[in-house]
UniProtKB/Swiss-Prot annotation:
Residues 33-55 are annotated as: Disordered. It comes from the Bacteria. This is Small ribosomal subunit protein uS12. CDD domains: Ribosomal_S12. One of its GO terms (biological process) is translation. GO terms for cellular component: small ribosomal subunit. The keyword Repeat does not apply. The modification 3-methylthioaspartic acid is found at residue 102. Part of the 30S ribosomal subunit. Contacts proteins S8 and S17. May interact with IF1 in the 30S initiation complex. PROSITE patterns: RIBOSOMAL_S12 (PS00055). InterPro entries: NA-bd_OB-fold, Ribosomal_uS12, Ribosomal_uS12_bac. It comes from Geobacillus thermodenitrificans (strain NG80-2). With S4 and S5 plays an important role in translational accuracy. Interacts with and stabilizes bases of the 16S rRNA that are involved in tRNA selection in the A site and with the mRNA backbone. Located at the interface of the 30S and 50S subunits, it traverses the body of the 30S subunit contacting proteins on the other side and probably holding the rRNA structure together. The combined cluster of proteins S8, S12 and S17 appears to hold together the shoulder and platform of the 30S subunit.
Amino acid sequence: MPTINQLVRKGRQKKVFKSKSPALNKGYNSFKKEQTNVSSPQKRGVCTRVGTMTPKKPNSALRKYARVRLTNGIEVTAYIPGIGHNLQEHSVVLIRGGRVKDLPGVRYHIVRGALDTAGVANRMQGRSKYGAKKPKAAKK
């Protein structure tokens, strides 16, 4: 336990907060050609690579991912949620934060139904998370 005098001399050290999605906290000023500290909920980017990867130990699957170069110049790995996708190299996508627990290094999700990414076809429940439109009512 510190004395009052020790606290006056040194003070308490501030806890540093480390972001879980650091690429969303950086902007880019193309006029000055420098990085800026502008946080945003989503960012646009271009796919440089689309592929599959296998998850960590107890799980087994082929998870779809895309390597995305963001508008701020940072390149990140993003997960493609849902069944089936239409992404390929040079597709323009929107990414949001949110890691995939069983894929190391994947800290971002691609937003389905935004920009070049199509929504999941034939999805009836949880449609808003996958960019699926409401199905037309059946005619009698």
